[in-house]
Amino acid sequence: MSTDHSDFTQGSILKKLSLFMLPVLGALILQAAYGAVDLLVVGRFGSTAGLSAVSTGSQILNLVTFVVTQLAMGVTVLIAWYLGEKRPEQIGAVLGGAAVVFTILSVGIFILLVGFARPISVLMQAPEEAVGLTASYVRICGGGIFFIVAYNLLSAIFRGLGDSRSPLLFVLVACIVNIAGDLILVAGFGMDAAGAAIATVLAQAVSVVLAVALLIRKKLPFAITRADFRLNPQCRKFLSIGLPLALQEFLTQLSFLALCAFVNRLGLTASSGYGVASKIVNFAMLIPSALMQSMASFVAQNVGAGDQKRAKKSVLTGIGVGLVFGCAVFALVMLKGDVLAGIFSPDAEVVQKGFEYLKGFAPETILTAILFSMLGYFNGNNKTLWVMAQGLIQTLLVRLPFAYVMSIQPNASLTKIGLAAPVSTLVGVLLNVGFYLYLDRKEKRVQRAD
């Protein structure tokens, strides 16, 4: 592997991590932007029921997307390991096996979302006026799930190769297509939530075609043969990394779906306000998410190269970068949350409800700078079972019980429900700091024994 921008085993940690993270962040910003455009256009040109439908439906789609992304993290880490170990010839089998596994996964998700869209919408306690529109949104997105899964897998492959710029291009094109689709189908033809769903699927399809074309043209340090496209031994390796992350992410997103259901019981206005707040939250979480994804690739290369000391230094660098931006976002959300909510809806009551939720959620923007940097380190170190375990504790023992108790209070408010996220993340930070110190002491004992 050449000593270029994709080699993380030497040079300034801050510079290398930042240069890799910026395109990742850019891609996440654009991805959140085209998700926000759906809500923005439906909020301006559709109905209140349509706004609620996109809010609830996108929560369901987010669950699927985030689980697929975490499963694909196993592919990213394994590719980075092989590059760090100077064994790129193994990567062809990784890519071929991943293509087969994720195709099988897509078929299962397709059947679930298309065949059970309405029961899922009812289970989510979508307001009665919005059940039909929510089911339509979920069904259409489910029909295009092959493109959504393929996009996330291809982006994971490029990041594993140390290329975070190409995924930025993919999502930029997708964003442009989605905006055009929303304006034509929702604003122009009045298709409401269904139009937003069609635009989303079309955008992902175009980005997948572009990604495949670039991968074919890219000068790769390995060969891919037809024989690689099977359930080969590499599948077990990347699944052993990705499955714990996917399960943890599934339960985390399930907890947010449950939270959405708790909010939906408070009425249509609260549901729409929460949907608006969720889009703002998606933007607020972009920097921690970019750090976690970048950290996993950065750490995996250094672990593959046998440089654990450099991998550890990158954690502190990541936390420092995250805290600077996290504090700025916290101040923005607390001081101007109502202005941000007003971007997505002209309804004063919806804006007020959205701001209520943001007030409770705001501390999360600081805490995740620490948590996500550490999780990226553990992911790159193949400590994904721990990542899963701490995630289960946060989700099942803290976030869900806290949100449920807050939602059934006589004076229930979105601010109190919003506190569930930072409270559970604080517990996660304490758990991960403890585990990091435990591993550090264990490593030092082994070194002294040697």
Cite the ranges covered by each PLM segment.
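Short alpha-helical transmembrane segments in multi-pass integral membrane proteins
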Residues: M1-M21, I79-F146, G188-L243, V299-E364, ...
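Short runs within selected transmembrane alpha-helices of multi-pass transporters and secretion channels
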Residues: A72, C141-R159, P167-C175, A196-V209, ...
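Helix-terminus/linker motif at the lipid-water interface of multi-pass membrane proteins
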Residues: I29, A33-S52, S121-E128, I184-M191, ...
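Hydrophobic transmembrane alpha-helices of multi-pass small-molecule transporters
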Residues: L63-F66, N178-D182, S207-V212, F283-L286, ...
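Small-residue-rich hydrophobic transmembrane alpha-helices
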Residues: L51-I111, I148-P167, G273-G337, T368-Q390
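N-terminal transmembrane alpha-helices
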Residues: F8-L40, R44-F45, Q59-G74, L78, ...
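Transmembrane helical elements of multi-pass membrane transporters/channels
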Residues: L19-D38, I140, A174, A203-S207, ...
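Transmembrane alpha-helix boundary and packing residues in multipass membrane permease domains
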Residues: V24, L28, L40, V77, ...
